[in-house]
Regions:
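Hydrophobic/aromatic beta-strand patches that form the interior of the parallel beta-sheet core
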Residues: 1, 29-31, 61-63
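A short acidic (Asp/Glu
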Residues: 11-15, 38-45, 73-75
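C-terminal or mid-to-C-terminal helical accessory/interaction module adjacent to the motor/catalytic core
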Residues: 57-145
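Sequence-level detector for tyrosine residue identity
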Residues: 6, 18, 27-29, 90, ...
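Arginine/glycine-rich "motif VI" loop of SF2 helicases in the C-terminal RecA-like domain
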Residues: 20-24, 48-58
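Acidic, glycine-rich catalytic loops of TOPRIM or P-loop NTPase phosphate-binding modules used
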Residues: 1-24
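Acidic beta-strand-to-loop metal/phosphate-binding motif
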Residues: 25-37
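Short acidic, S/G/P-rich loop/turn micro-motifs used as interaction or catalytic elements
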Residues: 6-9, 34-38
Length: 145
């Protein structure tokens, strides 16, 4: 499931219902701006899911943008908007998620997902995927004759 910004109550309720049906832990990864609203949006998602699915094993992790990424990648910052009601106590400059290269974001998501797959299973899935691509190319080429 993907949500942008603050997730709606309906979305969170549906997500919590789904998570409640799982027999395995749920891993929720958050990517958002590093500013008062972006950080708060992630916190609210985490709180709401735990409240709506109290018996579920939920692991929440913000994978972008983090203070460590800002420093390591020298991401461009901007002054935090003082007009944001959540700015009090946020004593850092802000960084937009868009400051991270799209390929880097894909890699962050890929790595987060790979942590949960047995290495052998990933190799098998990649081989099956490549085989399917080859078959599709064959059919496309045959259809164009």
């Amino acid at each position: 499931m993907v949500a942008r910004g603050y997730a709606s109550l309906t979305f969170l309720h549906e997500a919590a219902e789904y998570i409640s049906t799982l027999d395995v832990p749920a891993y929720v990864y958050h990517l958002g701006d590093f500013d008062p609203s972006g950080v708060n949006a992630g916190e609210k998602i985490n709180e709401a899911l735990r409240e709506m699915a109290p018996n579920a094993d939920i692991f929440f992790e913000r994978i972008a943008v983090t203070p460590e990424q800002i420093a390591a990648w020298d991401l461009p910052t901007r002054p935090t908007k003082t007009s944001d009601s959540r700015a009090k106590g946020f004593d850092r400059d802000s960084v937009e998620l868009d400051a991270i290269d799209p390929e880097t974001l894909r890699a962050l998501v890929r790595e987060a997902i790979k942590r949960h797959l047995p290495p052998h299973q990933l190799v098998v899935l990649k081989a099956a995927e490549e085989s399917e691509r080859t078959q599709i190319r064959y059919f496309v080429d045959a259809a164009s004759i």
